[in-house]
């Protein structure tokens, strides 16, 4: 028999083990449940996590996890998967779940580029009932539906979102509010209907007025802003000014002692270099400031230009077109004439011209530095501009062309006058008009390839969607098609813009040196085309537009746009009537910004508009040289130029906003 104390000891050990086993047996066998989801809060986890929780959860929480999964899928850029989950949401939802469903509907529509549906979904929400997280998403979706178009609704969304943000996001909100304001014309900002209780919005508009009235003088601007802060001490921008405004106030202009002008003075491009140089000299000497009140001058008898043949826009030699007797449309764009001359460089500044066709670029840059130049304008040809990266120079450089891949250099800006540049501006303009599916109708060949790629890239950046392309042959093919009565069916193919691009050719004033990029295309698309951007000569356009009209009814007809390639001197009244409704872009100088100067320069170049455009480029080269520091240092800085409204991108690539005109009843009218 075991001793009593041993039995008691063993029993004392066994009983707790049995009790623990009984306790564990009563516990559930699966892992502990995750905390209940909060659909009104943040969605920080991955969509995979939320989808897994949805599969494992009970019916009570299943819809919450699914709503979070949809939001996470949208954050990850997976709109198709988000749409699939959205369509399987249960019909019976709580009030909070229905509210989140409605907000997700707006976000999903915006992600699918259906801005009308997104706006409709937002309008059904009670903003006051939303959580702070939901309010932030509500305003972000409102901002997205504006698609970059400045409006009072966009400003109100930024203002409402501002108290919800902190740190870098708060500063970014102030910067974007200011950007939207500065993108408005004075007429647009002056016409804003501000309610009596919108003190913050009124403060923003007053700050804009102070900036516009004093931006030529940093000292005056600083004083005006200080007065503004006194009047609006609690305004969010009174504590932290927008970054761009701070840069303007703190801007320190750099001095320019001498300019080196790099141009090809021999070879095919000589005629273009001559036009640029003449425009540059005219702007430097202040001649364009007096052109508006002086009589047109006779064409010069320069033997270097006499008897030359102008390359046409397709790269072949052609005679200059006949004179165009009709007056240019009166544009709303202000004349750019004296602005840079009065506020910029002195007309007595030394300028030395270097011939890039006679020696290597590296030698010229070294020589220019030794000659005391502090600013280089040029080179002009794209292959020479590409060499700048491998030939670094301490000099500030305003290149007159743009490489395919721009690398940010602290001392280089790029100013190009090319059909690709014009196509990028057209994509922005067409997108701003609310079009959803544009088609680029371009000629077969290298020029068409490059324009299609440039337009498609810009369109994708604006909308996140693909543009369509369609090609046509020469005038003989077009005539054969129109004689057959077949018309032109718009059947585009989506352009898949290649990220790896070969070096493109150079087009200067119509001279093309090809090195093409072949855009890739997928299956044909014919429906929902609401805009057609046509790259054609006047003769080609006179055939293409009637063929489009022949195949489409007036109700289903897409809006038609064209490039400056279609506009030249000598277009008669029959052509203008045939082009009814078509919109096209061109430089302000040819759109009537300065009619007297246009008449003078057109006469000087025998109505060859390609050379007039290069003359305007020379004018703007002087303007940009006068404001090189602002363009290089102040993001978004704008200058009214002869080739467009000039502004600098992040890499100091000069963007040109062109003037758009439209044919109406045989007349040219500005597109406002």
UniProtKB/Swiss-Prot annotation:
Domain of life: Bacteria
Keyword hit for Ribosomal protein: no
Cystine connections: none
Keyword Lipoprotein recorded: yes
SUPFAM superfamilies listed in its UniProt record: Periplasmic binding protein-like I (SSF53822)
Lipid moiety-binding residues (N-palmitoyl cysteine): 27
Alphabetically ordered keywords of this record: Cell outer membrane, Cell shape, Lipoprotein, Membrane, Palmitate, Peptidoglycan synthesis, Signal
HAMAP family associated with the record: LpoA (MF_01890)
Name used for this protein in its record: Penicillin-binding protein activator LpoA
Protein's organism: Pectobacterium parmentieri (strain WPP163) (Pectobacterium wasabiae (strain WPP163))
Lineage, broadest ranks: Bacteria, Pseudomonadati, Pseudomonadota, Gammaproteobacteria, Enterobacterales
């Amino acid at each position: 028999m075991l001793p009593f104390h041993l039995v008691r000891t063993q029993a004392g050990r066994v009983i707790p083990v049995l009790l623990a086993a009984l306790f564990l047996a009563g516990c559930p066998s699966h892992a502990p449940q995750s905390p209940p989801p909060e659909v009104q809060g943040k969605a920080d986890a991955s969509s995979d996590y939320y989808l897994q929780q949805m599969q494992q959860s009970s019916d009570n929480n299943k819809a919450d996890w699914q709503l979070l999964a949809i939001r996470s899928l949208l954050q990850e850029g997976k709109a198709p998967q988000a749409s699939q989950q959205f369509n399987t949401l249960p019909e019976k939802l709580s009030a909070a779940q229905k509210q989140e469903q409605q907000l997700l509907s707006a976000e999903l529509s915006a992600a699918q580029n259906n801005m009308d549906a997104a706006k409709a979904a937002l309008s059904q929400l009670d903003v006051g009932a939303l959580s702070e997280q939901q309010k932030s998403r509500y305003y972000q979706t409102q901002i997205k539906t504006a698609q970059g178009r400045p409006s009072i609704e966009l400003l109100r969304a930024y203002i409402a979102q501002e108290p919800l943000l902190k740190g870098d996001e708060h500063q970014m909100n102030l910067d974007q509010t200011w950007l939207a304001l500065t993108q408005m014309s004075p007429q647009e900002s002056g016409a804003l209907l501000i309610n009596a209780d919108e003190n913050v919005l009124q403060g923003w508009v007053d700050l804009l007025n102070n900036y516009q009235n004093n931006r030529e003088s940093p000292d005056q601007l600083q004083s005006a802003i200080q007065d503004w802060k006194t009047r609006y001490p609690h305004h969010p921008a009174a504590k932290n000014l927008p970054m761009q405004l701070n840069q303007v106030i703190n801007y320190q202009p750099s001095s320019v002692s001498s300019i080196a002008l790099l141009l090809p003075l021999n070879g095919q491009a000589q005629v273009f270099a001559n036009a640029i140089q003449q425009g540059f000299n005219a702007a430097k000497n202040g001649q364009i400031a007096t052109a508006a009140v002086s009589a047109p001058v006779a064409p010069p008898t320069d033997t270097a230009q006499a008897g030359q043949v102008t390359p046409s826009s397709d790269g072949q030699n052609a005679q200059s077109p006949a004179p165009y007797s009709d007056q240019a449309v009166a544009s709303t764009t202000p004349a750019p004439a004296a602005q840079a001359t009065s506020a910029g460089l002195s007309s007595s500044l030394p300028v030395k011209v270097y011939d890039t066709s006679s020696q290597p670029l590296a030698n010229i840059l070294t020589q220019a530095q030794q000659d005391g130049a502090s600013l280089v304008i040029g080179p002009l040809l794209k292959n020479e501009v590409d060499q700048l990266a491998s030939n670094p120079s301490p000099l500030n450089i305003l290149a007159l062309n743009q490489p395919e891949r721009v690398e940010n250099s602290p001392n280089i800006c790029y100013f190009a006058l090319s059909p690709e540049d014009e196509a990028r501006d057209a994509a922005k303009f067409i997108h701003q008009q609310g079009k959803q599916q544009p088609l680029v109708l371009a000629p077969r060949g290298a020029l068409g390839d490059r324009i299609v790629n440039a337009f498609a890239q810009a369109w994708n950046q604006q909308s996140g969607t693909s543009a369509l392309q369609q090609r046509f042959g020469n005038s003989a093919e077009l005539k054969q098609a129109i004689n057959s009565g077949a018309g032109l069916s718009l059947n585009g193919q989506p352009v898949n813009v290649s990220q790896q691009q070969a070096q493109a050719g150079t087009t200067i004033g119509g001279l093309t040196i090809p090195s093409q990029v072949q855009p890739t295309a997928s299956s044909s698309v014919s429906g929902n085309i609401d805009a057609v951007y046509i790259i054609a000569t006047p003769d080609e356009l006179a055939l293409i537009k009637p063929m489009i009209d022949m195949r489409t009814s007036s109700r289903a007809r897409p809006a038609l746009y064209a490039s400056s390639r279609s506009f030249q001197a000598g277009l008669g009244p029959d052509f203008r009537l045939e082009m009814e409704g078509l919109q096209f872009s061109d430089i302000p100088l040819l759109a009537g910004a300065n009619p007297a100067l246009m008449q003078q320069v057109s006469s000087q170049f025998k109505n060859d508009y390609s050379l007039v455009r290069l003359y305007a480029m020379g004018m703007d080269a002087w303007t940009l040289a006068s404001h090189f520091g602002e363009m290089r240092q102040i993001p978004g800085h704008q200058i009214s130029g002869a080739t467009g409204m000039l502004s600098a991108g992040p890499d100091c690539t000069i963007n040109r906003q062109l003037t758009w005109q439209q044919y109406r009843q045989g007349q040219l009218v500005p597109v406002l």
